């Protein structure tokens, strides 16, 4: 069927902010889809609230709206733009739910807007648990015994009938939100109650648990002419019971027979045809390891996290083709862009093994609940490609950036056998390492399989890795064993530790013996057809397929997996850097390990190496490609940490030089630089042990801010008030960065702001100053930020511009740098300098219209600001007000305290823009799902030193009609100052009348809770905060954020005064 001519303008809905369960894979999908539709000649309108995405760049769609994805705003845009059609299946669960809401509101019908791609009825059938069950029964497809429930009592009654364990799956939620496995009545009561609350239709499926079955996924495509194919099938290392987003996954499936493969393939195709899905779809199945019995677990009728993995694993661009199918093209008409010669109807074939390992946030949240279940907890993932399972698994392990270069955590050698077995049976995020340790201790694969239900085949591969370790240890220097180890994915550093030499020595031995990697092409067809994709992975075999270009090239290092502190913003900068390299006439090469992102789409760069970002792997690529130099500024801390070893190995680092990077990152050198440049900073000292830290703090005076040097996202950063807390910090937290000392700084309570600057070494362009809404003490990544600044005097702005220029030139910055300031009594202090692109680059690029990463890259390659048409100094401010607001994933992370402080906790961001501060704030709150009604009850539970300020907020809330409730100390302070409040207990003896009870009953509309300086003793506060998160009640732990929300409410309310 030719593409449709009756539609001209199509609206695409993005997926909004990054949260656990919905990450960068939707930026990749949305970007591909918009470009694909434009390629076919359609006009594209995009709506997304997340500025840190490539898809919200002006050139991706014809009209880009960075607005909240809520009915109110999407309806306005629909009325204004009047598109002919809407494509919702590329915006994750957010896009689907929005389409359902628009349809139910009658607006699509009123405006004559057609839904493209998969029809609403099919989305409903796949997402509504009852309809899905009916369809499967009609198709004769087996599903586990189950019951749809709308109340907790119904859930308990059904479970009593079929017996425990049971699985709870809420309808229309993302990443298993609110679900879980329940072994008894008590657990079911809790999980079902929570699941019903989180489901937008108050519906859950309770089903018999089939935990222990193999989990197999099929990524399938279908077009309007009923052509359907399997793009990729994948097997989870972990059996059913652990969310697929938290499982290690291999593609293609490794342990199923051809008969089983065909049986599950037929089932998947039968389901996609019955649902009449047009585009991509993911089918999850459970296979009994002891028979040919299987169950259908669920179907995602949209592009998903698995689609991104399948696209990168096979090279087959699912989202791009799904968009073409949506406008009527069929798979047998679309040319596969990878081969350029076969049609998209051709099923990909793989002659390699792909491993995906999730990246979890527990290095940030040590107190978080690490047990894995049906609710997703990973923030990101890595992918690695190899010729065998061992190679791809070990490459993926070292891509994780959790300080391991192998499937081994050194600390586990100290763990008792009992503890080891416990951790293996009760799966946590690090179970792979515990299983590997058990194998090293002599437990057999069969014993471990019995305990974990993981297939013996995979455990045998772990045993094989251990056998090679032993061979290496007993054959030091042996080239035959060295080659075997390299063919099975061993890193030089691991071999060096077994041979008791340096990695450099191992590398030399390898090179002398000509044991070097070759690079193979990912071509979707197992080399059956000619292919020209510049997409490569390394292996130790024969025949290198990557040929060094005749053109001069530049290598850009990506930022690896998405984690808290290093998100999609860095991928955004990487992609823009590549565009600038190409525009300057060079060949751009990207190296990265993250399957979710735009940077690892092979059509972005001239060459893509899907490899771990370690010194060894990067050097191997450099030796083959011989680039002009390497750019490390855009890959976050991952890339910056590689600058020094690469430079020592003689590699040219482009942009700011290593010695200058060091001056910004090393505390003593930085202090010296600031003194020379005459720039004030809060008084501080470095300490290498506990006594030095205590001595420094006494000298400076408490409170002090303590942190390790060289970290990202405020890892292990704390504000300490007294010596006892400082000693405890030094004993527990300093392992964050053992080679570097701890910084002890005077903690200044002031207004914080930050600047991104771009310098060519002579002139400095400052695109803008962002003012944080929360005062110093909340990590910059968790603060709301306003551009242009709303309260800074001209004098302060001038000082900031002056200090920025001095710093950029004084530290010989070429390219980009980020500086954070704190302002107290009009005095400006520098808190820190990052000599690289920061997480604010996409936001600031969007609001100033300066493509900052592109400009910085051109300067890194030798051009000047003047040549690019930019002037020295602070760029003129925008007339609009733009707010960047953080978004958190606390609902997914049990036991993680939602209290904001100097360590970063947010997973994503949104932007709100309008002509006034209040309107921009309103949009930012709406986009980040912080919605406050115009009236209701608000609870204040406030620490001693903030009561005076809280009283002013409470009075303002009372003026607009809110009922003020407060806990004991806060209530008496408010009453003493003439404000009438209702007294409530924090955590009461009568658990029907305390704050969590009122939250459960829906009596509380918001909570404002601050803690004193002894944050640790705040057990009750943590229970209240968790309760608010669980029930979706807006929670403010910084008074400044509550003040911003009040501004919005006040601007929306009319003044009603008696005369």
Curated annotation (Swiss-Prot):
Mn(2+) 2 binds at residues 298, 300. Belongs to the CarB family. Mg(2+) 3 binds at residues 820, 832. The large subunit is composed of 2 ATP-grasp domains that are involved in binding the 2 ATP molecules needed for carbamoyl phosphate synthesis. The N-terminal ATP-grasp domain (referred to as the carboxyphosphate synthetic component) catalyzes the ATP-dependent phosphorylation of hydrogencarbonate to carboxyphosphate and the subsequent nucleophilic attack by ammonia to form a carbamate intermediate. GO terms for cellular component: cytoplasm. Mn(2+) 4 binds at residues 832, 834. It comes from Streptococcus sanguinis (strain SK36). Pathway: Amino-acid biosynthesis; L-arginine biosynthesis; carbamoyl phosphate from bicarbonate: step 1/1; Pyrimidine metabolism; UMP biosynthesis via de novo pathway; (S)-dihydroorotate from bicarbonate: step 1/3. Mg(2+) 4 binds at residues 832, 834. The lineage of its organism: Bacteria, Bacillati, Bacillota, Bacilli, Lactobacillales. Residues 547-929 are annotated as: Carbamoyl phosphate synthetic domain. NCBIfam families: CPSaseII_lrg, PRK05294.1, PRK12815.1. Mn(2+) 3 binds at residues 820, 832. Mg(2+) 2 binds at residues 298, 300. This is Carbamoyl phosphate synthase large chain. Composed of two chains; the small (or glutamine) chain promotes the hydrolysis of glutamine to ammonia, which is used by the large (or ammonia) chain to synthesize carbamoyl phosphate. Tetramer of heterodimers (alpha,beta)4. It comes from the Bacteria. The keyword Isomerase does not apply. Residues 930-1059 form the MGS-like domain.
